Each structure stands twice: as structure tokens, then as C-alpha cells.
Amino acid sequence: MQEGLDDGPDFLSEEDRGPRAVNVDLQTDATLQVDISDALSERDKVKFTVHTKSSLPNFKQNEFSVVRQHEEFIWLHDSFVENEEYAGYIIPPAPPRPDFDASREKLQKLGEGEGSMTKEEFTKMKQELEAEYLAIFKKTVAMHEVFLCRVAAHPVLRKDLNFHVFLEYGQDLSVRGKNKKEKLEDFFKNVVKSADGVLVAGVKDVDDFFEHEKTFLLEYHTRVKDASAKSDRMIRSHKNAADDINRIASTLYTLGTQDGTELCKYGLIPGHTGGGQREGRGGKIEARVAADEDLKLADLLKYYLRESQAAKDLLYRRSRALVDYENANKALDKARAKNRDVLQAETSQQICCNKFDKISESAKQELIDFKTRRVSAFRKNLVELAELELKHAKGNLQLLQSCLGVLKGNT
């Protein structure tokens, strides 16, 4: 029953991957192009085949592929975050961990309840769960590809040595997941960072541009988070409506065939008036609406929720550098007043000044690019979603008109 979904591997070829789940308006450079050409699922692991084309002299070949796992993507992301040289850049958000537990649990429950349903019902539910699993799998691959493409499109991060090793080194990178101790350390670091962030947030920025961006991003992140939660509820409602319509359609179809009437051809029921299909056309339309909203809206919101957090992290690093610079100025004044350790204080003050200026210089352009990127992505996806919604609305209208015609005896 679970063949190809749990016990066996799942192979995702180029033609099966479909469009990228999230449009992040990547302005790719032909000198370095990265994509995930294939992916293989083996129980709890997903192996991604990362394909690279490049004319850069840093690489030994112009075209090559390597196999990478999720932990290696996280390692690459963390190496960017921990590198002080990249403190002034928005680090592309790490792709979410592959999670197929819910789909596999549903398949297991389906197998346990096989004896209580007809063969037709079992086959139909199995196909639906397989489709759900494949959709999650495609989305997982797409999010990992988006991360790599964002790095490859960045004028600075694309030159990183770790990124080149990730793309070119043919062997396993020997990267493991974090153990409990490391996860606990990360937790405490985040607690300290959150507390420090509250203190830093109260500092008035010396630059109006960054003060405005800080205020805007706090509000923007909150709004996107709220919109993401509401879009998930909306999509869930469409899916529930599709399931309910299909159940009603199946019941009415059975009733219509049992009492010798043509009831099965009324309402939002079969795909054609001659019967033979138990799945309602109205249900199919609702399911397509849910799928399109998930692809064009929910995924976009989830991505930019993570990207806006990365932008907030950039502003935090700059504010932290500003506070350090101001503290260094105070320490220098005290050293001069006491005429003690002046040279050391001057050196420290100069280091803090250089760090703050360097972060500020790159951060401004990063935030401008982020605005351009998100506006373009939202415009594109919302226009496409509106066009799809119109298409589905017309389909619903035609279906209702057809049903009315049948009920009135016009057809």
C-alpha cells in the first residue's frame, strides 16, 4: 500500500518538478546557475542532486553535479550567519526541514482501515494521499532550490568558499545534525539575543533611513505572519469544502443509481451527465482553488516571513554595532580623562567605527534590493492568483448554469 511512499525511494525528475513554489524574483547571472535537477526520498532523508553551470575560474569544470542532504544546506546557511564578513547582508533564509510524517501517518491509518472500505474507496483515498505526499515533496525540493538560487544570485555570497565547496566537492561533507547540547546552546543564544534585541531596539538610530526601515520591518513581519496564518485557514476551508462536496456527490450518485432515477446527474455531482463518476465537479474546482492559493499565496507569505526575519536580523546586527560604537566612544572619553589605556581605547573605538560603517554601507543596498524583490514577487504572484481565481469562478458559474439547465429540463 505504501510502496513508493515509505518503504521505497521516490525519484523526482526534472519534468515532474513543475514550477518553482516561490517566486523570489531572482536576477540570475549566467556565469553561475544552480538548480536541483533530481531528488530522492529514502524514509527520513531526502537526497538532492545539485546541478551547477558556471564559467567562473574558481571552479575546475563548467558543469557538474553533487548529492546533498538537508543538514548540508543548514550547514551552509549557518556558515553565512556566523561569518562576520557577512554581517551587513541579508542572509537567505534556510529551507525548512523535510517533513513527511503527517502524510505517512495518514497512509498507515489508511492501511489499517483497508478492511472497512470498498476497493474503490481505498484506491481513491490512496491516490489522494500519494498526491498530497508528492506535492509536499515538490515543495521541499523547490524551497531548497530557492535557497541556493538566492545565494548564487548574491554578488558577495556567491563568492564564498564554503558555497563553492558545497557546489563542487563530490564527497559527503560529513555534516551532522545538532545534538541536544548544541540545540540547548542555540536556545540560550536566542534567549540572550531576544533580550539584547529589546535593549538595542530602544536606541534611536542616527540614520533616518534605517530608523524607518526598522519601524517598517517590525510592522511588515507582523502583518505577513498574520496573513500567512489566515491564508492557511482559508486554504483549509477550501479543502474541507472540496471533501464535503465529494462525499455528498458520492452519496447522491449511489442513491440515484439505487432508486432507478436520474438523480445522479443533478447538482454539482458527476464530471458528465451520463454518470460514471462519483467525484463532484464542484469538489474538483474547490480542490484546484486550494492548490493554487497554496502555491501562489501561502508559500509566498511563508517565504517572505522568513526573509523579513532575516532582514530584521540584519538591522539587529547593525544596531548592535551602533551600540558597541557608542560604548567605545564613552570608553575612549573615560580613558582620556584618566589618561590611562588611551591607545587601547582608541584602537577599540576605531574597530567598532569601521565595523559599523561597513555594515551600514552594505545594509542600505540590501534593504533597497529586498524591497524591489518582494514587491516584484508579490505583484507577480497576486496577478497570477487573481487570474486563476477568475478562471475557477467562471468554471463554477458554468457548472451552476449547467445544473440549473438540467434541473429545469432544458437539457
Regions found by a protein language model. Give the residues of each.
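Phox homology (PX) phosphoinositide-binding domain
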Residues: 1-226
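C-terminal, extended alpha-helical scaffolding domains
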Residues: 179-411
